[in-house]
Amino acid sequence: KNGHENPWNLDFFGVGNENWECGGNMIPDFYANESRRYQTYVRNYHPDHPIHKVCCGANVDDYEWTSEVLKTTHNHCLKELHGNMDGLSLHYYVHPEGWEIKGSATDFDDKVWYKSLNKALFMETLIERHGHIMDEYDPEKKIGMIVDEWGAWYTVEPGTNPGFLYQQNTMRDALIAGITLNIF
């Protein structure tokens, strides 16, 4: 009834998600200790198929989160275990008009068009600055930065269920994706 007869053959396992907010409203060192605790139970069951443990990283430019999580996970950890993680996540969404009123997915002017594309370029700054912090704790670059949530996020379309976060895509979104992928 419960479980699965065979292993799922996972490639990546995120130890938490958005723990700084909806994933627990945790402060960095509390989450880092929880990550240290729970990653212990994520084991490699086949030598040819390792599971990459991904620690919950920052939301946008919360560089303090990155620094504190890495500091805590690396404390009392053998150097060769690089904080008991293989990756550190990062989330960044383009909100042309800001978080509270994100703006329409389809009704926008040239100014908002260019503002959106410019905000997509901010991903490069985020990668560089979070990467610099990661290098302080992991100079051998054993921990990968995993940008696991990104793109454009607009106000929910009128008449749709707000819990489903439906938004229509346009050429602007294709360009945001192209800019972002080019940075990677």
Put a short name on every predicted segment.
Residues 1-109, 128:
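N-terminal catalytic cores of secreted or lumenal carbohydrate-active enzymes
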Residues 61, 72-83, 87, 110-184:
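Catalytic-core region of carbohydrate-active enzymes that cleave or remodel glycosidic bonds
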